[in-house]
Swiss-Prot record:
It catalyses: L-citrulline + L-aspartate + ATP = 2-(N(omega)-L-arginino)succinate + AMP + diphosphate + H(+). The gene is argG. It comes from Erythrobacter litoralis (strain HTCC2594). ATP binds at A10, Y11, S12, G13, G14, L15, D16, T17, S18, A37, G120. Keywords: Amino-acid biosynthesis, Arginine biosynthesis, ATP-binding, Cytoplasm, Ligase, Nucleotide-binding. This is Argininosuccinate synthase. L-aspartate binds at T122, N126, D127. Its EC number is 6.3.4.5. It is found in: Cytoplasm. Belongs to the argininosuccinate synthase family. Type 1 subfamily. PROSITE patterns: ARGININOSUCCIN_SYN_1, ARGININOSUCCIN_SYN_2. Its main location: cytoplasm.
Amino acid sequence: MPDIKRVVLAYSGGLDTSVIAKWLEVERGLEVVTFTADLGQGEELEPARAKAQAMGIPDKHIFIEDLREEFVRDYVFPMMRANARYEGDYLLGTSIARPLISKRLVEIAQETGADAIAHGATGKGNDQVRFELSAYALDPDIKVIAPWREWDLTSRTALIAWAEKHQIQVPKDKRGESPFSTDANLLHTSSEGKVLEDPWEETPDYVYSRTVNPEDAPDEPEFITIDFERGDGIALNGEAMSPANLLTALNELGRKHGIGRLDLVENRFVGMKSRGMYETPGGEIYARAHRGIEQITLDRGAAHLKDELMPKYAELIYNGFWFSPEREMLQAAIDLSQDKVSGTVRLKLYKGNADVVGRKSPNSLYSEAHVTFEDDAGAYDQSDAEGFIRLNALRLKLLGKRDR
């Protein structure tokens, strides 16, 4: 890859990206800029600065940024307006974080005069696709370096040996250890590898880091309310909150009640099936609540159309097409549908469950007068149903006469 002198690396401070940072310098002769994003992963990020400094990277080329509000406001909430779940289950916690990281990688490359960006995603997974599609959409001329697709460090042992040779500190719990891949942000935590690679084996409880076992959750339910305005959450139990603060508070409630665990075998974009364990405590509560407020504010046609669009929208995010015109077209339609999605949802949190038990809205389409089993005082003429049924039955009658 010619004409590259400086590269911006998506840097976590962990062993893999520390090796990559040094490898880019030693093997490729590049000047390295590191970028570490705080997306609410719950880790202290200043050690990443110290590790970068220890490798000789100057302070002006070390970027650590708090992106939590931008992440939830501009990525998570728009996705939640669509009720997006990949393959019906996965709330896309890893997928939705990649576009923002890629955006800042490209921007920092432009700010620092770098010729390329680099990431630590492997050649087997989805993240390489997500990072690179996003980067190319934002800067068609950017160059991307993906060391896992290039180098000969094909085993954990080889990686550790290379790290030790170049004076990179190796944590004791990494020595001789097979990869156990984790990802975390304010929306979720995911785990893959090791015992999870056998889809028949139940996920051991020690793998879960973000939620209590539902069996050990409180024996008494907890009731909460979430207020929505035009499809976005704005308050918890009547207290106004920013997007990131709202999700943080819901995460704690979900953790306490064991909500949001998902054991999933999914279809990766690159073609293989993989098994992952996901914890999305606050996101699961929020998604249930959003669905609840839509139930009384969305017209049937709009609601059903949204449900038809959702799988495609979720697939686009999963596959890395956040910055594509088709995702933006779908987003425009979804956002338009949210104009009247305002009100309050009450939920019951209990031993792994988040159940909607009440909803109200000034824009409600629910008419108790029409649905009551008591006297509706003429609100609905039941005899009208006869003609409705007759018209809808016409084609079925004609088919029946022909085929039966």
